[in-house]
């Protein structure tokens, strides 16, 4: 059911936003400035997707989740307790971004099955954004060859 897929997306995106937001404030090291800005771009983009996702849930006649407990329950992404070093932040966001892509692909399939083209278009835009983050995060993590 598309509404359930969107709720999972909503919770997962919220967790992704919170994690990138925390990494933005807590990153340290020689690449601080660059990573601080990069994490900011990610969390701002994730935040911007929350409201439209909730509105599409309402459009389908369901209520959007509205509590931290419900977000945690719905999310495919685990919360962050400790503050990792910069490289581990990148590795974790890379893995979480792949989880976002999986959730988005499931939503896209549901939207197409239910002939909800407007929602499918929104999801396609999110897939494009997270596809870009995937190659950017992969590039940050690439080890130079000797």
Give the positions of each predicted feature:
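Alpha-helix capping/hinge segments and adjacent helical runs
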Residues: 12, 58-66, 96-99, 146
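Conserved alpha-helical segments that form or flank metal/cofactor-binding pockets of metalloenzymes
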Residues: 34-70, 137-140
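Short, contiguous alpha-helical
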Residues: 120-146
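Short, helix-capping/interhelical loops that line the mouth of catalytic, cofactor-
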Residues: 26, 33, 62-85
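Short, surface-exposed loop/turn segments at secondary-structure junctions
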Residues: 29-39, 117-120
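Acidic/histidine-rich alpha-helical segments that form the ligand environment
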Residues: 5-6, 16-19, 51, 55, ...
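Secondary-structure edge/capping motif, primarily at the C-terminal ends of alpha-helices
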Residues: 20-31, 107-115, 141-144
């Amino acid at each position: 059911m598309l509404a359930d897929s969107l709720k999972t997306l909503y919770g997962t995106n919220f967790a992704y936003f919170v994690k990138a937001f925390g990494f933005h404030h807590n990153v340290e090291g020689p690449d601080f400035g660059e990573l601080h800005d990069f994490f900011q771009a990610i969390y701002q983009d994730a935040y911007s997707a929350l409201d439209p996702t909730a509105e599409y849930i309402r459009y389908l006649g369901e209520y959007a989740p509205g509590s931290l407990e419900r977000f945690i329950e719905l999310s495919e992404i685990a919360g962050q307790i400790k503050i990792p070093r910069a490289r581990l932040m990148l590795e974790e966001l890379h893995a979480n971004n792949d989880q976002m892509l999986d959730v988005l692909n499931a939503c896209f399939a549901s939207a197409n099955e239910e002939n909800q083209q407007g929602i499918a278009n929104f999801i396609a835009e999110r897939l494009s954004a997270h596809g870009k983050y995937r190659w950017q995060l992969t590039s940050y993590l690439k080890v130079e060859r000797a």
